Design a protein with these regions (language model features):
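Alpha-helix C-cap/termination motif
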Residues: 35, 53, 84-88
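Active-site-adjacent loop/helix micro-motif of nuclease/hydrolase catalytic cores
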Residues: 41-42, 67-79
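Beta-rich catalytic cores
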Residues: 46
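Non-catalytic C-terminal interaction segments of nucleic acid-processing enzymes
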Residues: 4, 31-34, 38, 98-100, ...
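Conserved catalytic cores of phosphodiester-cleaving nucleases, focusing on short active-site segments
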Residues: 50-67
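Short amphipathic alpha-helical segments and helix-helix/interface helices
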Residues: 29, 78-82
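Acidic-basic catalytic patches of nuclease active cores, encompassing PD-(D/E)XK
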Residues: 1-42
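Nucleic-acid nuclease catalytic cores
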Residues: 85-112
Length: 173
């Protein structure tokens, strides 16, 4: 991630407080749409955070962001992810912490591999990362943040929903 992108995310974090995670999730959804995924659904409230079709496969993402250098997985998170694996989906954890030089980690979820109730740095997720998928969004995410961070700061979730509506592959749950 470019230094400028980190700086813009820091501005976003300072401006919106607790809404930061949901806004970054929407920015990630927009970045995926920029890479021409199919049938992307973004959920801001309950259930799967992002669900999309990539190369004909159903892929689901639990998005974890943090204002610190770690994230926390809850038992509820893992139970839901376990069910999705059983249903045959490709399941990922999309992790972005606020540690210096951190970038998105898109880690394939493997049941039993991640502890709950602990603060986890990005390190444990690295063993399961999908580098091809990460490469797919890196440039797009920088571009999306550059273009849409002002909308996120000034118009919040409703503003980013307006951006999402401009993509034919987007759908709301």
């Amino acid at each position: 991630m470019k230094h400028e992108t980190h700086a813009k995310l820091a501005r976003l974090r300072a401006a919106v407080g607790r809404e930061y995670g949901k806004l970054v999730q929407k920015l990630l959804a927009i970045a995926f749409l920029e890479t021409e995924v199919q049938k992307l659904v973004e959920r801001s409230t309950q259930g799967i955070d992002l669900e999309m079709e990539i190369a004909g496969e159903r892929c689901v993402f639990e998005v974890k962001t943090s204002e610190s250098d770690s994230v926390r997985l809850t038992p509820k998170d893992l139970e839901g992810l376990d069910r999705l694996v059983e249903d045959g989906a490709r399941v990922y954890l999309a992790v972005l912490t606020n540690a210096p030089f951190d970038d998105w980690i898109l880690a394939r979820y493997v049941p039993g591999e991640f502890p709950t109730g602990k603060n986890l740095t990005s390190f444990p997720f690295r063993a399961h990362r999908d580098r091809d998928l990460e490469q797919r969004i890196f440039t797009a995410f920088d571009r999306v943040v550059d273009r849409d961070v002002h909308t996120a700061i000034t118009r919040r979730q409703g503003g980013l929903d307006g951006v999402l509506q401009g993509y034919p592959a987007w759908g709301r749950a």
